């Protein structure tokens, strides 16, 4: 049985309030400021009646022989009341201004803190999610949750607090004032209350639905923009400007269309509420003209009731306006909380080791990616011991990189078999301990927008010495180009190393793996971006790195794995051949054909 939209909204709202607990002092201060602000408005209207009735009174007619004669002396004013009025007004509005400052500052502080806390939580949660989740999610939507959705939540929270407390107190104060002065005239408000409530309920559902659609549309905008920026060179090279422009225009127009839906709902709801309110005001004016009412009304009383009704219109309008903002925030909360409720990467293992020997074994491993029927790996079985090099070769999509990904538990859920490191299942290791035993250099190098030195020492921030960094860079043959840079190791590489060539980025990644000094080394096309000369230069460094380490090398260039202790030929998830370079050539099978394609006879 699913929860009703009302129950779901209340659940989300209660969860959101949990973020305000650490700021309860500031929250209470802001609420007090808002209450004072609303009460001052109500108090100001309450002074209208006494000010008119006592400050001014009708001119007293002259009496001659029992006949009242009109005079031209105007009103008889109570000077004491008139003298006090300016002082009261100044004091009240000074108090109102101070209350406004306190509440505005407090709400701004809480909104900024809420954005910071939620963004931090979402960012940290991304780091705990499995690779399989990140693979299937739209990057633009993930970024939008950190940037756009958290802003929506904070804005909605601030607007809702201001309107619900300040405008709510104002409306309640005005209603109390009206009933105190004339409960008969004030009863008409109770008639329109349910009608207003019905309109707000209907519009709220529309707001929430459209707001979710807006968040999806914003994610699409972010994704399309990111895709164009990342592929900017390819777009220009292949003349894809018109295609990308048309694609973005379509997505952009969809986003505009969703925003217009929300604008229409807002534009209809606010005037509708005001029209309903005008009927109440018109009824009060009509009722005041009835003889039965005149006996109970003074000029001051009527002015107070009329002023209170007029003063209520703007707060009521604000409450209907904030409803749209609030529903937008609730929709954003729902998407963010759904993300935060996504289960993090499974880490049930408890086994830890400072440094493993590096004996790696696959025991009859079968594996399928989520949502795919065909097995990515089918009964993979091999063993590689400390100091040995295992090479994986085969066509693209044959399953080589999947084997490497399973070693680091980027993907879990084996259909059969087990993977063991030093005769202990990798699923018994804690994730931190397991991954500290592995150094990975993948085909697609990731560098961070930082210095070369910090990228090399990424696994040991603040711990690796300058000498260790230089040594790793030297072994990777990276110092050759680093020394030619104006700032050397302190050179900023730009976003994802954009200021460096592909080969330079690859060498920095290799230096990073060297500094890691892990017992298991995975090289997934580690030299793919290097030219022949650079590849030869770095090969000696890789040979040095492999000593006393278990190395798993994935390569298309067969020249880089000729010295491997064992070569596995993988095709459609199965091991079809295994042996040394020499024995596989003599076998004359798939490996020999691949070798012949690259080097001829």
Swiss-Prot record:
Disulfide bonds: none
Binding-site positions, ATP: 394-401
EC number: 7.5.2.6
Membrane topology: Multi-pass membrane protein
Keywords, in A-Z order: ATP-binding, Cell inner membrane, Cell membrane, Lipid transport, Membrane, Nucleotide-binding, Translocase, Transmembrane, Transmembrane helix, Transport
Subcellular location: Cell inner membrane
Organism superkingdom: Bacteria
Pfam families: ABC_membrane, ABC_tran
PANTHER family linked to this entry: ATP-BINDING CASSETTE SUB-FAMILY B MEMBER 10, MITOCHONDRIAL (PTHR43394:SF1), ATP-DEPENDENT PERMEASE MDL1, MITOCHONDRIAL (PTHR43394)
Name the record gives this protein: ATP-dependent lipid A-core flippase
Originating organism: Shewanella sp. (strain MR-4)
């Amino acid at each position: 049985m699913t929860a009703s939209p009302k129950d779901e909204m209340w659940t989300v709202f209660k969860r959101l309030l949990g973020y305000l607990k650490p700021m309860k002092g500031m929250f209470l201060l802001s609420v007090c400021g808002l209450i004072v602000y609303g009460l001052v408005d109500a108090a100001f209207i309450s002074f209208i009646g006494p000010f008119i009735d006592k400050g001014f009174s009708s001119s007293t007619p002259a009496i001659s022989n029992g006949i009242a004669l009109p005079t031209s002396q105007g009103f008889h004013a109570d000077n004491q009341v008139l003298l006090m009025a300016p002082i009261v007004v100044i004091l009240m509005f000074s108090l109102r201004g101070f209350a406004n400052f306190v509440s505005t500052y407090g709400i701004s502080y809480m909104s900024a803190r809420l954005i910071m806390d939620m963004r931090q939580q979402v960012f940290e949660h991304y780091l705990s999610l499995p690779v399989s989740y990140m693979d299937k999610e739209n990057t633009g939507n993930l970024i939008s949750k950190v940037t756009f959705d958290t802003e929506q939540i904070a804005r909605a929270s601030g607007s809702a607090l201001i309107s619900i407390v300040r405008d709510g107190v104002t409306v309640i104060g005005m209603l109390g004032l009206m009933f105190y002065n004339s409960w008969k005239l004030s009863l008409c408000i109770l008639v329109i209350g349910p009608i207003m409530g019905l309109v707000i309920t209907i519009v709220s559902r529309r707001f929430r639905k459209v707001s979710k659609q807006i968040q999806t549309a914003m994610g699409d905008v972010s994704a399309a923009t990111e895709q164009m920026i990342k592929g900017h060179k390819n777009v220009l090279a292949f003349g894809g400007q018109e295609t990308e422009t048309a694609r973005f225009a379509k997505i952009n127009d969809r986003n505009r269309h969703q925003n217009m839906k929300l604008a229409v709902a807002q534009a209809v709801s606010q005037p509708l509420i005001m029209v309903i309110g005008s009927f109440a005001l018109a009824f009060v004016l009509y009722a005041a003209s009835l003889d039965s009412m005149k006996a109970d009304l003074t000029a001051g009383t009527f002015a107070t009731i009329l002023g209170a009704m007029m003063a209520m219109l703007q707060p009521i309008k604000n409450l209907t306006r904030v409803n749209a903002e609030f529903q937008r925030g609730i929709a954003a909360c729902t998407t963010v909380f759904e993300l935060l409720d996504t289960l993090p990467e499974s880490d049930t293992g408890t086994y830890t080791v400072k440094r493993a020997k590096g004996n790696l074994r696959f025991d009859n491993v079968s594996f399928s990616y989520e949502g795919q029927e065909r097995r990515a790996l089918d009964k993979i079985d091999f063993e590689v011991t400390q100091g040995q090099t295992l090479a994986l070769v085969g066509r693209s999509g044959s399953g080589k990189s999947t084997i490497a990904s399973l070693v680091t538990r980027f993907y879990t859920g084996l259909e059969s078999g087990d993977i063991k490191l030093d005769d202990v299942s990798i699923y018994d290791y804690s994730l931190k301990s397991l991954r500290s035993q592995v150094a990975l250099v993948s085909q697609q190098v990731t560098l961070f927008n930082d210095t070369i030195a910090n990228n090399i020492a990424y696994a040991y921030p603040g711990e690796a010495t300058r000498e260790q960094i230089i040594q790793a860079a030297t072994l990777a043959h990276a110092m050759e180009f680093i020394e030619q840079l104006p700032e050397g190791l302190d050179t900023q590489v730009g976003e994802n190393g954009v200021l460096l060539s592909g080969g330079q980025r690859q060498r920095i990644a290799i230096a990073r793996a060297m500094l890691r000094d892990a017992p298991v080394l995975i090289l997934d096309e580690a030299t793919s971006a290097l030219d022949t000369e650079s590849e030869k230069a770095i090969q000696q460094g890789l040979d040095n790195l492999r000593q006393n380490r278990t190395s798993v090398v994935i390569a298309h260039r067969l020249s880089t794995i000729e010295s491997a202790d064992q070569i596995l030929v993988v095709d459609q998830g199965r091991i079809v051949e295994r042996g040394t370079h020499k024995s596989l050539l003599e076998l004359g099978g798939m490996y020999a054909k691949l070798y012949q394609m690259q080097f001829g006879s």
